[in-house]
Amino acid sequence: MSGTVIRSKTLEDAHAHPEMIRSGAFSPAMQAGPFLYVSGCIAGDLSQDMTGQAQQEFSYVELVLQEAGYQLTDVVKLQAFITDAANYAAYSAVRKQYFPQDPPASTAVISGLLIPDALLEIDVVAYKDDK
């Protein structure tokens, strides 16, 4: 099955890390049937703490979803890669702001990341019946 590439028109406004924008090595998202797979994202302002980085990343994910005709309530799976378990509570608090009810299935992994000073990387899968 081939998919449709979703190219975010406003990546720079979405708080995405500049290296992600410049690389062009991957698509911000790929739609395959009713599913939308949003690539892992890293905050643009890495001087912020976990709360700030998480807010940037969820804002980015929300924008990519909207550009593809989806919304946060369509997210069925979320993966988070966190560099330090001590930051999990801060990440979780932000996550609850974006998914206050019926949160998606989720996985959190403690892991190193490719971008120095990044505390978090998230990716999501969304599903929509009418796609």
Where do the language-model regions lie?
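N-terminal presequence-like segments and the immediate start of the first folded domain
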Residues: M1-V76, I82-K131
